[in-house]
Structures are given as structure tokens and as C-alpha cells.
């Protein structure tokens, strides 16, 4: 079993391997429920059980793609395996692989074409591609507030302004704190352009179950690491 993707059962036994992972569709709209195609499966006998728990591990992205899943159903088609699963753990967000496949070398702010929570796919793609980065792109950080249209686009823009394209800064203030705390030793300058309108965009779209996540909370946190200039 030498495919770059491997599936393990809940006893950590290797049950199959394959050479390509295709994100098919989040067809129900239910969180974490989606379908994939496992391409070029290396085993003739598929040793999987419906309604079972499994783990996917792969050689790509230094293990950042790995996740656990519950297998609802599957079928074999032309040497490929189509599966219906619920993802139960991991930092991978469905759609991140497709984002990288079609926009890996795109230097523009590709999240601007994504609506609402779909921006989490870009954030997850940033984590897959670059992980936790340590090198800041510029001596002065410039946040372009005109590109912040909602809560999640703030995290896209912040990661972009600090680390560059596909810069990962998380999708919550707890994650921002952890990353900045490990990255910044002394305060550096941060210019936030079009700050007022971006504050409104953030505050009007904070998810209902997110507490202490307003623009005011963001400024309090960033002030510990930056000399902030609001424009």
C-alpha cells in the first residue's frame, strides 16, 4: 500500500491507499458532511465498513491535511472509490484543496470572490499551504480595509497583510493571539486603511456564537503587538 493517501481504521490499521483526492460536493449543506472520490485505489478488495470511523493521512502538506471521518456510504467506480463522509476532526475545511488546485499561484485576494463562510475555505487552504509562518512580509503592515467585507474576510486580509498570499492567521482571535505571540517580539507599525467602514463590516457579521470578537476586541488584541494607525 504505497499511495500518497492512506486510510486507517480506528485501531490504527492501514486498510487502503490511493493516489488522488478529489473534493466532490457538500451536497446537503450540513456542516462537515460531504463526498469525495479516492482516485486510483491500490487495493482490489476494499476493506471498509459503512457506519465506521476512519482516519485519512497523507504525505502532502506535512500532515496538515490529515483528518478523521465517519463513513456513511461508498461505492467503487472504474478503480476509484466514491465516499460519503462526515469529517469529525482536523483543521482542514472542505473546499480548501480545490482552492489550491485552481488558484495556487494566484497572488490576488482570491477570497473576494467568496461569500460569507466560504472564506473559511481560503483560510484553510492558507493553513494547508503554509502552516504557521514565522517570517513577516513587510516592516510596516498595511491592512486594506476596503477588502474587509465581513468577519471572515478580516482574517483573510490580516494574514495577507502580515505574511503575504495564503498567509495564515487563523479564523478567531484566539488563533490570532497564538500566532502573533509566537511571531512578533517587539511592536511594529500597522496602518489600517478605511478602518471605520471595515469595523462596521466586521461587527455586522460576527457569528452569533462568537463572543469577544468585535472590532473593538480586535483592536485591543492587535494593540499588544502593533503601533496601530487608523486611517
Segments predicted by a language model, with ranges:
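Phosphate/adenylate-binding glycine loop and adjacent helical scaffold
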Residues: 1-3, 8-113
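Extracellular beta-sheet-rich ligand-binding/adhesion modules
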Residues: 143-146, 171, 187, 210
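Short, structured protein-protein interaction patches enriched in aromatics and acidic/basic residues
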Residues: 174-207
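Extended, compositionally biased accessory segments flanking or bridging domains
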Residues: 3-6, 107-165
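Extended catalytic/binding region for NAD+/ADP-ribose chemistry, centered on the ART fold
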Residues: 165-177
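Hydrophobic beta-strand segments of well-ordered beta-sheets in folded domains
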Residues: 139-141, 186-194, 226-228
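Helix-rich interaction surfaces within compact, conserved domain-sized segments
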Residues: 199-231
Amino acid at each position: 500500500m504505497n499511495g500518497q493517501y492512506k486510510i486507517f481504521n480506528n485501531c490504527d490499521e492501514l486498510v487502503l491507499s490511493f493516489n488522488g483526492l478529489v473534493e466532490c460536493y457538500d451536497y446537503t449543506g450540513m456542516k462537515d458532511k460531504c463526498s469525495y472520490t479516492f482516485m486510483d485505489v491500490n487495493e482490489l478488495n476494499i476493506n471498509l465498513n459503512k457506519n465506521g470511523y476512519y482516519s485519512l493521512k497523507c504525505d502532502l502538506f506535512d500532515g496538515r491535511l490529515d483528518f478523521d471521518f465517519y463513513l456513511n456510504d461508498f461505492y467503487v467506480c472504474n478503480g476509484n472509490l466514491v465516499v460519503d463522509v462526515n469529517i469529525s476532526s482536523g483543521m482542514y475545511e472542505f473546499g480548501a484543496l480545490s482552492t489550491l488546485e485552481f488558484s495556487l499561484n494566484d497572488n490576488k485576494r482570491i477570497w473576494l470572490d467568496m461569500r460569507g463562510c466560504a472564506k473559511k475555505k481560503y483560510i484553510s487552504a492558507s493553513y494547508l499551504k503554509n502552516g504557521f509562518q514565522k517570517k513577516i512580509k513587510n516592516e510596516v503592515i498595511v491592512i486594506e480595509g476596503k477588502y474587509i467585507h465581513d468577519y471572515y474576510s478580516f482574517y483573510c486580509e490580516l494574514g495577507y497583510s502580515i505574511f503575504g498570499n495564503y498567509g495564515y492567521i487563523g479564523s478567531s482571535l484566539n488563533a490570532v493571539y497564538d500566532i502573533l505571540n509566537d511571531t512578533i517580539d517587539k511592536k511594529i507599525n500597522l496602518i489600517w486603511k478605511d478602518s471605520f467602514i471595515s469595523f462596521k463590516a466586521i461587527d455586522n457579521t460576527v457569528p452569533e456564537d462568537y463572543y469577544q470578537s468585535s472590532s473593538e476586541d480586535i483592536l485591543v488584541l492587535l494593540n499588544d503587538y502593533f503601533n496601530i494607525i487608523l486611517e
